[in-house]
Every structure is written in structure tokens, then in C-alpha cells.
A protein has these predicted regions:
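N-terminal, charged low-complexity regulatory/assembly segments
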Residues: 2-227
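Functionally constrained cores in energy, signaling, and assembly domains
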Residues: 30, 279, 302
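C-terminal regulatory or interaction extensions
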Residues: 194-278
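Short, leucine-enriched amphipathic alpha-helices that occur as contiguous helical runs
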Residues: 276, 285-288
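Short helix-to-turn junction characteristic of helix-turn-helix DNA-binding domains
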Residues: 280-284, 292-298
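Short capping segments at the starts of secondary-structure elements
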Residues: 298-304
């Protein structure tokens, strides 16, 4: 249901993770395309360290346990890379992979095979809308494969996206079943190697409640209030530790467990970098560059100079 303007939103802040969502975040990162993409937590750590001048010793204690879980799942998941790439690679300009759309369908219609023809069509169209990132009800007119093909052509989809949508239209049940098996395997490995994160999840839930309150627009800017759901569930997120993600199709917000810590670290070293620059203004360019290089390579990197 959609929240009416001015009415309060029912927001539930959970203190536990969603293992299936964690594995989708994990595998999406592995297959995220692009030359600048970070495909594992270690690469994310290097990116954060380089971009914000955060010393490695600040990030390693936070991220190493998560990196070990990620590596354990990726190393032991007995599914071909081709099939993983099919489900977990974002395509075209879509922000998310096919896995999210199918996962929502799995939760909503666990017995897809027993649905009536009209119910199956509605589920397929909802899944495709989510996958294509098009407005709600954009596919309500689609009742046959010809309608779908016409829509895809008008929508300017890539050939890869057209093929996936057509395949889903014909064999949705097979893809739901295959993804369900993959997620069961992945979550089993994930939970098997997961350390105790009880306190971390509680802290994240408390911080999320403080930041969001009863209005997600406090942390998600430029939201269309008219399209907000009446109820939202907020989950702590380990594999999406450094960000916030709102799954509109499922009314879930995934709140990164280190969002607060990383924000504080970025601020801390941003302030120290500004202080360092001001102290070096009177030094010649050559000497200044040599000092900066020494600090960057040394143990005092990130510390203030008195």
C-alpha cells in the first residue's frame, strides 16, 4: 500500500540481517561490471583508503571479518560462474541484477507453480517491471509475448536485456527454482562462516532509527513522497556495509553496518588533511611533495602534525 501525503509511515527497525539479501549483495559485487568497479571487499577497502586518505589500520579491523566471509562463500559455492553471472550481473543501465527481482517473486509467491494463469502473468509482469526499473503498472497491458516484445523495443533495451525478459516470460518457474537453490547454497555457506554480529546489528538498528526516524527522506534525498509505501522494514546490512539501499519493490531498506563508522572516518581524515595542507602552505612545492609522500608511506599517515 502507498502512504498518503501527511500520514505517518510505519517503520520497523530489525536487529537481524537477511541472509538471502546479504548473499545477493555479495554476489552482485563479485560480478559488477565496469573498469572502476570494486568486485570484492578488499578492493572496496583500497578504494575507501585511497579516495578519503583513511589509513589501512583504521579499515582492516572493520572489514577483514567480512572479507573472510565473502571469500569463504565465493570459494566454496558449487555453482558455475556462468549461472552466477547470469543472475547477479546488473545489465544495461539497471542498478540491480536479475536476482533481486526473482528473489522478491520467490518471497511473494513461494508456490508459483500452483498459481492460476492470471496470477502467474501478474507475477511475471511485476518481476519484469522491477528488473527493468520501470514505473509500477508499466506492463499492465502486456498479456502475450508480442506485447512484451513491443514494449522492450520501445523501451530501448539492449539485446541482452530483451533476451532475459523473453526467457523469463516463457520459463519463470525454472528461473525461480534455480535461483532458490543458489541462494540456499550461498546462505548456508554464509551463515556457516559468519562471526557473532549481534551487537553490531543492534548498534546499526539504533543508529538507523536515529537517522531515519519516521521519514526515510532524511537519508534518501529527492524522494517522491506520493510513491512511498505505508510500511518499511529496515535491515542491518553486512555485505552492503558502506551504504544505504532501498528496495522499493519489497519495501525494505538495507542499512550498512559501518555507514556511521565510515562517515566518521571520512570526516576525521578530511579535517586532518585540511589542517595538514594549511600547515604546508609556506613550504616550497618540492619540499611539500616530499613530505606528503613520506607521510603517505609512513606509520604516521593520517595523524595530525603539531
Amino acid at each position: 500500500t502507498v502512504k498518503e501525503k501527511g500520514s505517518p509511515m510505519n517503520i520497523q527497525f530489525l536487529t537481524r540481517i537477511c541472509p538471502e539479501a546479504e548473499c545477493i549483495f555479495l554476489l552482485e559485487r563479485r560480478f559488477r561490471p565496469g573498469m572502476d568497479a570494486q568486485n570484492n571487499i578488499e578492493q572496496v577497502r583500497h578504494y575507501l583508503s585511497d579516495k578519503y586518505d583513511i589509513p589501512p589500520f583504521e579499515l582492516e579491523p572493520l572489514l577483514q571479518p567480512l572479507a573472510e566471509v565473502e571469500n569463504y562463500v565465493n570459494s566454496n559455492l558449487s555453482v558455475s560462474e556462468e549461472r552466477l553471472r547470469f543472475f547477479f550481473t546488473p545489465r544495461g543501465n539497471a542498478p540491480n541484477s536479475l536476482a533481486w527481482s526473482l528473489y522478491n517473486a520467490i518471497k511473494q509467491d513461494s508456490q508459483y507453480g500452483s498459481l492460476s494463469g492470471s496470477q502467474k502473468l501478474r507475477t511475471v509482469n511485476q518481476t519484469l517491471q522491477h528488473f527493468l526499473d520501470v514505473p509500477e503498472n508499466a506492463l499492465d497491458h502486456v498479456t502475450c509475448i508480442n506485447d512484451l516484445v513491443q514494449f522492450l523495443m520501445k523501451n530501448g533495451c539492449t539485446e541482452d536485456v530483451k533476451w532475459v525478459c523473453t526467457a523469463l516470460y516463457y520459463s519463470m518457474d525454472e528461473y525461480l527454482e534455480e535461483l532458490d537453490v543458489i541462494l540456499r547454497k550461498a546462505t548456508g555457506l554464509f551463515l556457516e562462516h559468519l562471526p557473532d554480529v549481534t551487537d553490531l546489528c543492534r548498534q546499526t538498528a539504533a543508529y538507523a532509527k536515529e537517522q531515519i526516524g519516521d521519514d526515510p527522506s532524511r537519508v534518501f534525498l529527492n524522494l517522491n513522497v506520493a510513491t512511498q509505501p505505508s510500511a518499511v522494514t529496515v535491515y542491518p546490512c553486512l555485505m552492503g556495509f558502506h551504504g544505504l539501499s532501498w528496495d522499493f519493490a519489497d519495501s525494505r531498506i538495507y542499512f550498512g553496518v559501518y555507514y556511521e563508522a565510515l562517515t566518521n572516518l571520512i570526516q576525521k581524515y578530511s579535517d586532518q588533511s585540511a589542517s595538514l595542507v594549511s600547515r604546508l602552505k609556506s613550504i616550497g612545492d618540492k619540499s611539500r611533495l616530499e613530505i606528503l609522500r613520506s607521510l603517505k608511506a609512513g606509520e604516521c599517515n593520517g595523524q595530525d602534525i603539531s
